[in-house]
Regions:
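Charge-rich cytosolic interhelical loops and cytosolic tails of multi-pass membrane proteins
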Residues: 1-75
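A sequence-composition feature that detects small, non-aromatic residues
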Residues: 11, 57, 75, 92, ...
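Alpha-helical interaction segments
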Residues: 20-24, 50, 128, 143-149
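Generic structural signal for hydrophobic core residues of well-folded globular domains
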Residues: 38, 103, 162-165
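Membrane-proximal, non-transmembrane alpha-helical segments
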Residues: 41-122
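Alpha-helical membrane-embedded segments
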Residues: 98-104, 124-144
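A broad "ordered helical/assembly scaffold" signature
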Residues: 110-124, 132-133, 138, 158
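Cytosolic/matrix-facing juxtamembrane and C-terminal tails of multi-pass cellular membrane proteins
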Residues: 121, 136-168
Length: 168
């Protein structure tokens, strides 16, 4: 997580006073909710003093929203977040496997054109295109920004549970 979120997770960061990811009215409503449900939760004047409180609040909220039947959107966004994070962790392997596939396809094409093997050229071209597309996907789509975006969506879904009747 430190690779994409070096300081705080998106839900924690969203609750800081300096953050503009959530409008101030909604943030005040969340603060009120946490004050009513978590003993010792308080709002501090600066972000550094607020960090332990928002971290505790998010941890508490995660533990209260684990039921997938009551909170399906949170479960879905958490799954998406975890999936994108795992993809980023596998990026080097994905690029390596795609490059090996491209090299293998080019070698087969070389052998085909020099009549060492008899293979349908359409299949070779199709598999080369597929490997190239996967290589492009690994390079340009699976990025830190994809994980950060998924993390922010999860944070939004998680914090919106404060407005749910299921927690009151």
């Amino acid at each position: 997580m430190k690779k994409c979120f070096p300081k705080l997770l998106p839900a924690q960061e969203s609750l800081l006073l300096s953050s503009h990811q959530i409008d101030s009215i909604t943030k005040q409503r969340y603060y009120k909710f946490f004050s009513e449900h978590i003993d010792g939760f308080k709002i501090c004047e600066n972000d550094s003093d607020m960090i332990p409180y928002v971290s505790s609040a998010v941890t508490w909220l995660i533990s209260k929203t684990r039921d997938c039947t009551k909170f399906p959107l949170i479960a879905e966004e958490n799954t998406n977040f975890g999936f994108t994070y795992n993809l980023l962790g596998l990026k080097a392997y994905g690029i390596t496997v795609s490059c090996i596939g491209i090299f293998f396809n080019l070698a087969l094409m070389f052998l085909f054109f020099y009549n060492f093997i008899c293979v349908d050229l359409k299949i070779l071209i199709a598999s080369l295109v597929i490997n190239l597309l996967f290589l492009l996907l690994w390079i340009f789509i699976v990025t830190k920004s994809l994980v950060i975006s998924a993390g922010k969506k999860y944070a939004r879904a998680l914090l919106s549970a404060c407005d749910s009747n299921s927690l009151n």
